[in-house]
Amino acid sequence: MIAIVDYGVGNIANIERALKELGEAVIVTSDLELLGQAEALVLPGVGAYAPAMARLEETGLIEFLQEQATKKPFLGICLGMQLLFESSDEDGQTEGLGILPGTVEKLPSDVRLPHMGWHQLKNHGEAVYFVHSYGAVCDPDWIVDSVEYGRLVPAIVQKDLVTGMQFHPEKSGEVGLKLLKEWRETTCNSTQQSI
């Protein structure tokens, strides 16, 4: 069973629908016991970094998620991916979950923001749907795929059991479903493979 973390911020219905379309058993919850019982966790997110971190703190999820990320497959999507890192410079400096070393920084001012629309992944070679103005800056060894948008933007990162997708797989049609399926089949079944 996959649990989608419900902390009041995120595009939950679409990611739930996408995972169910792949035949997954899915629950949407903020209940720590149910989240702890899940085989894998998905942290969605839409909006701004600081309010999202505040919601995670209000719901008592920060330490729990930090611990769970060392025990089971954990997927952060869009803002959910950004929250995995140590901090963001959005609206000042905001501390993140710190599950992945690295920061989240505003994309260059010489490109149109937000970065919205379809963009081809360098390694997978297929287009996925993005909506964001900030991107991760992290160890290149963890970047599974990327796009070029004013700078190198990590589109998929993976370290141990933790995976982040900056784009919205649930809004990326068949390609998004394929990438979610790859995450489920590889990351959830083996800590040694990457998507």
Swiss-Prot record:
Gene3D superfamilies: 3.40.50.880
One cellular-component annotation, GO: cytoplasm
SUPFAM superfamilies the UniProt entry points to: Class I glutamine amidotransferase-like
Pathway: Amino-acid biosynthesis; L-histidine biosynthesis; L-histidine from 5-phospho-alpha-D-ribose 1-diphosphate: step 5/9
Domain Glutamine amidotransferase type-1: 1-193
Protein's cellular compartments: Cytoplasm
Annotated GO biological process: L-histidine biosynthetic process
EC assignment: 4.3.2.10, 3.5.1.2
Keywords linked to the UniProt accession: Amino-acid biosynthesis, Cytoplasm, Glutamine amidotransferase, Histidine biosynthesis, Hydrolase, Lyase
Main location: cytoplasm
Catalysed reaction equations from the record: 5-[(5-phospho-1-deoxy-D-ribulos-1-ylimino)methylamino]-1-(5-phospho-beta-D-ribosyl)imidazole-4-carboxamide + L-glutamine = D-erythro-1-(imidazol-4-yl)glycerol 3-phosphate + 5-amino-1-(5-phospho-beta-D-ribosyl)imidazole-4-carboxamide + L-glutamate + H(+); L-glutamine + H2O = L-glutamate + NH4(+)
One annotated GO molecular function: glutaminase activity
Active site: C78, H168, E170
Subunit record text: Heterodimer of HisH and HisF.
Reported function: IGPS catalyzes the conversion of PRFAR and glutamine to IGP, AICAR and glutamate. The HisH subunit catalyzes the hydrolysis of glutamine to glutamate and ammonia as part of the synthesis of IGP and AICAR. The resulting ammonia molecule is channeled to the active site of HisF.
Protein name: Imidazole glycerol phosphate synthase subunit HisH
